[in-house]
């Protein structure tokens, strides 16, 4: 019994192996509301998920799922919680576009079954710069007691004159 106690204490005091979270590689990603962009030989797929889920691939057959979303929990902009009571970290339906040498990513903040929602915007100079996303704020918001529409499902459109527009659904 004395030996067991010494071994148990030694195991508890031994340093634990610490490793960074490894990306998961899959050949068939199952996602909601995907959007894909291509930059410098790599495909970037963004989709509904906690902090905006992100995957990368060089061949569109083998996808590496990032262990954390584009926005980590601590990086979710404060305005999202102010605009959408009850919103946490589950971000919906991103859309991404390159416009004038910059990437823009629009996303929806909402709670299921409500039409108090908001569409936010992030910008970055490169999709490969995972720490370079800058919050550009809220583009549009809907309020359940005010509006009969819902600010979700953003989509960028560039017209024939090169002017950018944002459409959204619901």
What are these regions (language model features)?
Residues 20-170:
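Carbohydrate-active catalytic/glycan-binding domains of CAZyme proteins
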Residues 1-21:
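Bacterial Sec-dependent N-terminal signal peptides
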């Amino acid at each position: 019994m004395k030996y067991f106690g010494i071994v148990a204490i030694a195991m508890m005091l031994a340093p634990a192996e610490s490793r960074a979270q490894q990306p998961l590689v899959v050949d068939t990603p199952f996602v909601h509301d995907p959007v894909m962009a291509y930059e410098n030989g790599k495909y970037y797929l963004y989709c509904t998920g906690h902090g905006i889920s992100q995957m990368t691939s060089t061949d569109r057959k083998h996808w590496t799922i990032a262990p954390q979303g584009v926005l980590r929990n601590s990086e979710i902009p404060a305005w999202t919680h102010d605009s959408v009571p009850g919103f946490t970290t589950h971000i919906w339906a991103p859309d991404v576009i390159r416009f004038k040498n910059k990437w823009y990513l629009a996303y929806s903040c909402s709670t299921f079954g409500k039409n108090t929602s908001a569409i936010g915007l992030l910008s970055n100079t490169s999709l490969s710069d995972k720490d370079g996303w800058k919050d550009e704020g809220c583009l549009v918001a809907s309020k359940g007691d005010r509006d009969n529409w819902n600010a979700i499902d953003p989509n960028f459109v560039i017209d024939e004159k090169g002017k950018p527009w944002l459409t959204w659904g619901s």
